[in-house]
């Protein structure tokens, strides 16, 4: 396999998540609340669970309330493993 194929396969396995920015007070870092919905195996009820993750925002363009898309990446710091891809919708 060539290096290009290996890089494409590696990029395709990265998780892409969507969530709302809840904090932008740090430099080049945003906190994104990602919601996960799962259906209960027996009863079928939809269960919601939310998790806050830190993401790298190089240009510092995201603000509180923005709907953003983030991608998993190599560890950038102790608890920053995601990178901002795009802002889907700006806050009003």
From Swiss-Prot:
Superkingdom of this entry's organism? Answer: Bacteria
Which GO terms label this protein's molecular function in UniProt? rRNA binding; structural constituent of ribosome
Q: Does the keyword Hydrolase apply?
A: no
Entry annotated with the keyword Ribosomal protein: yes
Name the InterPro entries on file: NA-bd_OB-fold (IPR012340), Ribosomal_uS17 (IPR000266), Ribosomal_uS17_bact/chlr (IPR019984), Ribosomal_uS17_CS (IPR019979)
Q: GO CC annotations?
A: cytosolic small ribosomal subunit
Pfam families membership: Ribosomal_S17 (PF00366)
Q: Name one GO biological process term.
A: translation
Q: Which CDD domains match?
A: Ribosomal_uS17
Alphabetical list of SUPFAM superfamilies matching this protein: Nucleic acid-binding proteins
Q: What does this protein do?
A: One of the primary rRNA binding proteins, it binds specifically to the 5'-end of 16S ribosomal RNA.
Q: Can you tell me which family this protein belongs to?
A: Belongs to the universal ribosomal protein uS17 family.
What NCBIfam families does the record point to?
PRK05610.1, uS17_bact
Q: What is the designated name of this protein?
A: Small ribosomal subunit protein uS17
């Amino acid at each position: 396999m060539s290096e290009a194929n290996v890089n494409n396969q590696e990029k395709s396995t990265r998780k892409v998540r969507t969530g709302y920015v809840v904090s932008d007070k740090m430099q080049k870092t945003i906190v994104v609340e990602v919601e996960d919905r799962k259906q209960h195996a027996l009863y079928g009820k939809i269960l919601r669970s939310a998790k806050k993750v830190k993401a790298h925002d190089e240009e510092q363009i995201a603000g509180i309330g923005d709907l953003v898309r983030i991608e998993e990446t190599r560890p950038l710091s102790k608890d920053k493993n995601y990178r901002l891809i795009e802002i889907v919708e700006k806050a009003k």
